[in-house]
Amino acid sequence: MNKVTTYLIFIWIVAVVVAAYPTFVQGQVICNERAAILESLDNSYGEKIAEQGIDEGSLIVITVNLQGKWSLLLTPKGRPNTFCVPLTGNTWIQENNVSKGIAYNGSVLTIVQEDDGVWNMIYLDKNTGRIDDITTGYGWERIIDFNKLNN
């Protein structure tokens, strides 16, 4: 796959995510070098990588802090050193094979994962009541299990 095709696929994924949540962002989607995004989220909010998986070759990451504030990060295909942040929220909860959080517009992002790492991202739009299957992938893993930290 050439760079133009890879970039167009990434733009399509970001467009789908943004279209699915038309009211969640007050400003633009933030993209920067991976290390800079992770450092900024850690320094500003105490967020660490808690969960991650692969979608069509792109890395999808959820960072979370101990108070449940979270961010959704997407790595553009062919640009492994870049993250984009299209969605943030609070009240990140991890249950058996399900993780979910409330976006800042009151909508809900849910990730359902199978024991073999296959996963599905679902978005419930608070304003429309619409439920969208955003994307699916493989290799989902919990880096930090907050239930074990609290026990």
What are these regions (language model features)?
Residues M1-T6:
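Positively charged n-region of N-terminal signal peptides that target proteins for export
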Residues T23-N151:
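Polybasic/polar functional segments that serve as interface/processing modules
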Residues I9-A19:
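Bacterial N-terminal signal peptides
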